[in-house]
Amino acid sequence: MKRTFQPNNRKRSKVHGFRSRMSSKNGRLVLKRRRSKGRKKLSA
């Protein structure tokens, strides 16, 4: 059985990256929550 995590930086940033977060309203809400929480990293 193959492992479920197959690392791929391009896919990672396409799905979880800053620009993809900014491109939708809910993504912006995610960033807002993470800022208010004081996260060092906002997105992948």
UniProtKB/Swiss-Prot annotation:
Keyword Nucleus part of the UniProt annotation: no
Presence of the UniProt keyword Ribonucleoprotein in the record: yes
GO CC, any one term: ribosome
Top-level taxon in the UniProt lineage: Bacteria
UniProt signal peptide: none
Residue stretches of biased makeup (Basic residues): 1-19, 30-44
GO MF annotations, alphabetized: structural constituent of ribosome
Keyword field: Ribonucleoprotein, Ribosomal protein
Region (Disordered): 1-44
PROSITE patterns: RIBOSOMAL_L34
Alphabetical list of InterPro entries matching this protein: Ribosomal_bL34 (IPR000271), Ribosomal_bL34_CS (IPR020939)
GO biological process entries: translation
HAMAP family noted in UniProt: Ribosomal_bL34
Family: Belongs to the bacterial ribosomal protein bL34 family.
Annotated protein name in UniProt: Large ribosomal subunit protein bL34
Record organism: Bacillus pumilus (strain SAFR-032)
